[in-house]
Amino acid sequence: MTVGALLWVAVIQYFVVLLVVQSRWTTPYSWARNAISDLGAATCRYSDSVETWVCSPWHRTANVSWLLTGVCMALGALLLAKSFPASRTARIGVGLYVLAGLGMVVVVVNPEDVRAGPHVLGSLIAIIGGEAAMIILGVALLRAGYARGLGLLGVAGGTIAVIAMVLTLARVGGSAYFGLWERIAGFPVLIYVICCGLRLLFDRVRPRAARQ
């Protein structure tokens, strides 16, 4: 369990690297407008999708980070399967996190400016699969009466993320808000695995009576 939890906590590197790669841009980068995937684009170009210039000098660094994130999510979920409630609901949630991690790997090997079709498919699998995993795992935890805070976070955070994903796909606000909705849709998926990993690590050292 410890290795799986550490893998999930290691997902935090995603956010650190995101800021580092963003800081290397010489063209304007906006969290409201730019897609997350713009950081991993292999070429410099004008993006019709977000109506701005995209040029990421450290795109390889971003892609390595995303690859590690996908592997950590998927492998961590497999190793942590028995750490969650022994229910069909929990198993489905864990399985969806494996799928979401694999979706991130697909994103990495298919940069948005090289193979757009597979890239978009991988993004949808990673984000939508991860959102479903959050909600389903949250429900499983609430039903089992274990880690209620995590359960509520999964259901509430997942629901907000789903709404944001709908806004992303509907392109509400146009290009000016594409990046904002995408981040609200995708970031909770990663934040939740970090929180779950931390909780499981803390449970290794805390008395059982204090785990509610």
Model-derived segments and spans:
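Individual transmembrane alpha-helix segments
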Residues: 47-82
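Extracytosolic (periplasmic/ER-lumenal) interhelical loops and adjacent juxtamembrane/interface segments
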Residues: 27-58
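Small-polar-interrupted transmembrane alpha-helices in polytopic inner-membrane proteins
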Residues: 91-108, 156-165
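Terminal transmembrane helical module of multi-pass membrane proteins
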Residues: 137-212
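Membrane-proximal helix-loop-helix units in multi-pass membrane proteins
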Residues: 97-139
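N-terminal signal-anchor transmembrane alpha helix
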Residues: 1-28
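Membrane-interface loop-to-helix entry segments
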Residues: 58-68, 117-135, 181-187
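Cytoplasmic juxtamembrane regions at transmembrane-helix boundaries
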Residues: 75-101
